[in-house]
Amino acid sequence: MSAKTAVLLMAYGTPNRIDEVEQYYINVRGGRMPTPEQVENLSARYRAVGGHTPLTTLTKSVTDQLQAQLDAEFPDQYQVYFGMKYWHPLIPDVVKQIHADGISKVIGLALAPHYSKISIGGYQKQVDRANEEFNTNIELTMINSWQEQPKFRNLIANRISEALAQFPADVRDQVTVLFSAHSLPQRVLAWGDPYPDELLGSAKGIAEMLELPDWRFTYQSQGETGEPWLGPDVLDTLAELAAEGKKYVLQVPFGFVCDHLEILYDIDIEGKHKANELGLQLERIRLLNDDPAFVDLLKTVVTGQ
């Protein structure tokens, strides 16, 4: 067996072409067939952003950069892989590859800063199931949350400062900063899930760092499952801000690290359309994507284990 430790970066996944949307949707739904209307609705969203998102490409770039940064500081100690929850390369296939490469110790790191049993816990379940199904004997150390890392909060704070400069200097103190993260079903509250508290805690910490005069927290991109989801929803919050007489909004989707559909469609198209209807100027921060400073943050998270 190799003495190296595998680092398994994990993300949600995204189809690469429109004709892959249906199978991707089936994967997201745990094997249940979506209706033709649901497939068309999701396909239309992908068409609106150019047919695909850069999530896979960016995750590959982060993987390669993290490998280089780790090799420079810790030669021959780590091998970095990436796997996706709902599209290729699928996490179980990557677990098999890690085993085939003779590596038994794995650090699992989902590319999402805040823990929830549904989100981060779901990634761990995929590794555990693959480990059991393929008898790979992987020893997994899962990093559940890294939102308290000072480097993460500093990166988001810097992105906010950069984005506030998009507004005229005489209105910057009138900008409402709207932190957002992916909504989850309300049933997580019954579990005592830490997700809402982690989100509010990191939003408050970043807002205090910057001494933001007006900031809110909201959820976005809730699913269509027929059950209640965590709120308030960002579109409702935009309407409330307009009713309060606000004019300028900066959205900070700090629950995400990479450009994908929830950013490129839900904010850049749907959110901006709603804001325009309400007479609001809506801007957003640049996501971390494959910024070398973000990769440096991940190196800190990984080597701290």
UniProtKB/Swiss-Prot annotation:
Protein function: Catalyzes the ferrous insertion into protoporphyrin IX.
InterPro entries per the UniProt record, alphabetical: Ferrochelatase (IPR001015), Ferrochelatase_AS (IPR019772), Ferrochelatase_C (IPR033644), Ferrochelatase_N (IPR033659)
Protein name as annotated: Ferrochelatase
Location, primary (coarse class): cytoplasm
Pathway(s) where this gene product acts: Porphyrin-containing compound metabolism; protoheme biosynthesis; protoheme from protoporphyrin-IX: step 1/1
Positions bound to Fe cation: 182, 262
Species name: Herpetosiphon aurantiacus (strain ATCC 23779 / DSM 785 / 114-95)
Substrates-to-products reaction catalysed: heme b + 2 H(+) = protoporphyrin IX + Fe(2+)
Subcellular location: Cytoplasm
Family: Belongs to the ferrochelatase family.
Name of the encoding gene: hemH
EC number: 4.98.1.1
Gene Ontology CC annotation, any one: cytoplasm
GO biological process: heme biosynthetic process
Keyword list, A-Z: Cytoplasm, Heme biosynthesis, Iron, Lyase, Metal-binding, Porphyrin biosynthesis
Keyword Signal among UniProt keywords: no
Domain of life: Bacteria
Single GO MF annotation: ferrochelatase activity
Coiled-coil segments on the chain, per record: none
